[in-house]
Amino acid sequence: RIGRRQRQMCIRDSDGIFSNTKGRPLGMAFDSEENLIIADAVRGLISIDRDGKVKTLSTKSDSDNIPFKFVDDLDIANDGKIYFSDASSKYGYGSDRLELFEHTPNGRLLVYDPATKETTTLLNDLYFANGVALSTDESFVLVNETWMYRIQKYWLKGEKAGTSEVFIENLPGFPDNVSSNKEGIFWVALFNPRNNFVEMSSNKPFLRKIVLRLPELLQPQPIRHSFVLGLDESGKIVHNLQYQSNKAYSPITSVKQYENHLYFGSLTHPGWGKIKVPK
């Protein structure tokens, strides 16, 4: 579980607090040695061992020497390499709206190699690099571009290795996290449906600057809308799960499949959501 304590974020086990990152943990996964690897928006890429000891793995890219500002999500390959996103190299955690309304490509997809302890930038100029997920055979990795309503695909193997292409674009909402069920389906959590004002102001920077000066309560707000898509590994939508209601579990910012259920997480909604995997 993730719990908040005096504005610091703690990893909790069933008996209480297991470890305190003193930052803001977001995406996480266990490596082959049962260390919990965490994309911490404040601390960077970190590792927590079985005893709860926190170790910093990386705080900047060694290939371009640019420090992280907003490490967001990760996935770990069978060879131990950690693929992760830095949502923005300009704005830190809590400044999502600035990144949205400025609409500049400050995000990156990176890889950390535990064998060499080096971090390499794979893709840059992304519009809020968010969720990260490897394909079933690990021939490619996906990274969500939240503010462009699309998902990028970076090839790791084969003739296209080292190149990228759009996996899917023109999504009906803002893609947040993405995960693979390792059976050919990517589950994508959409924070919210597309916003009319964001669409209209996309090529009007002066208007976006005016809105940013307004109190947050007067700025465009998300609606109560649960939204998850299931994509096959060719980028085709095979599941479209939506529910709009004042009682909706929203916003959904992460989704994971475990056996026959989907589990939903949210940055703002207390608790977890759960439904059966649709047929």
Which residue ranges define each predicted feature?
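Blade-edge beta-strand/turn elements of extracellular beta-propeller
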Residues: 12-16, 51-67, 110-131, 152-171, ...
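Beta-rich, blade/repeat-based domains predominating
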Residues: 14-36, 63-82, 89-90, 103-109, ...
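Beta-propeller blade signature
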Residues: 52, 101-114, 224-233
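Short, conserved, GDST-rich strand-edge loop motifs in beta-rich repeat architectures
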Residues: 84-104, 191-222, 274
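Conserved beta-strand positions in repeat-built beta-propeller and related beta-rich domains
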Residues: 30-32, 36-42, 82-93, 125, ...
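Single conserved hydrophobic/aromatic residue that forms the stacking wall/gate
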Residues: 1-7, 11
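A short loop-to-beta-strand structural motif that recurs across blades of beta-propeller domains
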Residues: 44-47, 107-110, 150-152, 227-229, ...
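Blade-level signature of beta-propeller repeat domains, shared across WD40, Kelch, NHL, RCC1
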Residues: 251-279
